């Protein structure tokens, strides 16, 4: 899971 995109993953 990406660090900056972890919120956009879900």
Curated annotation (Swiss-Prot):
Residues where Arginine amide is found: 10
Keywords, comma-separated and alphabetical: Amidation, Neuropeptide, Secreted
Biological process per Gene Ontology, one example term: neuropeptide signaling pathway
Superkingdom of the source species: Eukaryota
Annotated tissue distribution: Expressed in the antennal lobe (at protein level).
Main location: secreted
Keyword Secreted: yes
GO cellular-component term (any): extracellular region
Compartments it resides in: Secreted
Keyword Nucleus in record: no
Name under which the protein is recorded: Tachykinin-related peptide 5
Organism: Acrosternum hilare
């Amino acid at each position: 899971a990406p660090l900056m995109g972890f919120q956009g993953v879900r």
